Amino acid sequence: MFGMLRALKTHVEAPIVVATRAVSTNAEKLEEIRERLAKGPNFQDFVQNPENSRSEWEKYEGKLRREKGEEQRLRLPPWLKTTIPVGKNYAKIKAQMRELKLSTVCEEARCPNIGECWGGGEHGTQTATIMLMGDTCTRGCRFCSVKTARRPPPLDVNEPVNTATAIASWGLDYIVLTSVDRDDLPDGGSKHIAETVREIKARNSNIFVECLVPDFRGNLECVETIANSGLDVYAHNIETVEKLTPYVRDRRAHYRQTLQVLTEAKRFNPNLITKSSIMLGLGETDGEIECTLKDLREAGVDCVTLGQYMQPTNKHLKVIEYVTPEKFKHWEERGNALGFLYTASGPLVRSSYKAGEFFITSILENRKKRQNATEIAKE
C-alpha cells in the first residue's frame, strides 16, 4: 500500500485515468485477498493443535476446576484441541453458504467439529447444521456467542427455497436445521422452519432432517407445526441442570418448559425421534446431571448428547470445570443404562454432532426398511 502511494506521488503529472486504474487494480487485488481469507480457515482454526494421543491426555497435570471466587481462566486441556478443518467438501459448503447468504450454527457457535461434519469424517456421513431466520437472536443466553437484539431483521422469504436448493446440491445424508429464537414473531418462526423442511423433502425425500428448535415460549401450536412438518428428529436442548438454568439460560427459558416441549412433540407425532443436549463444566454436580438425564427419559427423549461447555468470549460465562474423557465415558454408560436409544458423551460432542447423526441415520434407515417390508407384506 505504501509503495502504491509513493508511485502516485512520483507520477503526479500523469493523467488522472492512470491513477484511477492503478487504484482500481489494487482494490481488486485487495478484494481478492479478502475473499480468499473469508473462504479459508480463521485465526481460531490455526491456534487449535492436532489431536493429542490418549497417553498425553493421561499425563496432563493442569488444573481442571476453578474454585469459587477465582477469576483466572482455566487452561485448555489437550483433549479439547482439534485439527484445522480442511477438505474439498468443507470448502465447497463454506463457499456456497456465503453465496446464498445462509448461516450455520457450526460457524456462528464456533463448533470445534466443523471439519469432521462438513468433510464426512471417519463415518462417511456428511452433515451440516443450517441456522435459519438470520444470525441474530432475541434471547441472550450467557453461554452462547450468537448475536442478540430485541427486534432482528425481518425473515428472508427466500430462505426455505435457498436452503433446500443448497442442501440438494451438497449430497448430504443428514441435515440439521437449527434457528435463533424469534420472540418478536407471533409464531416464533415455526411456520418458516416447517416450510423449509417441506422444501428439503420435496427435493430429496431420502435425506434425514433434524430440527433443533426453540421452546416457542411454550406455545404448543408452534411445537405441533414443527412436529408434523415431515422432519425425522425433533431436538430441543435442555442445556444445563435445573438449578443452573436461570443463571445460564435466558430468563424466558425454563427447565420444565423444555421438558414439556419435548413431551408434547412426541405426543403430536409418536414416530419422531426426540433429542436433547446437556453442557457440562458449568458447576453442576453429578447428582444434578443424573436427575436431568432421568427427567429427559421421563419426557420420552430418545437420544441425548453431553459435551464440554467452552467459553466463546471473555463476555460469556467462565468454565468452572474441564470434565475428563473418563467422566464423559461414565455419563455415556449411565445414559445407555437409563434406556436412551443413543447417548453421545464426550468433551467435543455437541447437540448437532456427526457421530450421533451417523447412529441416528442407522436407526431411521432400519425403521424405513421395516416399514417398507410391512407394506410389501400387506400387498
From Swiss-Prot:
It comes from the Eukaryota. It catalyses: [[Fe-S] cluster scaffold protein carrying a second [4Fe-4S](2+) cluster] + N(6)-octanoyl-L-lysyl-[protein] + 2 oxidized [2Fe-2S]-[ferredoxin] + 2 S-adenosyl-L-methionine + 4 H(+) = [[Fe-S] cluster scaffold protein] + N(6)-[(R)-dihydrolipoyl]-L-lysyl-[protein] + 4 Fe(3+) + 2 hydrogen sulfide + 2 5'-deoxyadenosine + 2 L-methionine + 2 reduced [2Fe-2S]-[ferredoxin]. It is found in: Mitochondrion. Its EC number is 2.8.1.8. Signal peptide: none annotated. Transmembrane segments: none annotated. The keyword Iron applies. PANTHER family: LIPOYL SYNTHASE, LIPOYL SYNTHASE, MITOCHONDRIAL. This is Lipoyl synthase, mitochondrial. It comes from Drosophila erecta (Fruit fly). The gene is Las.
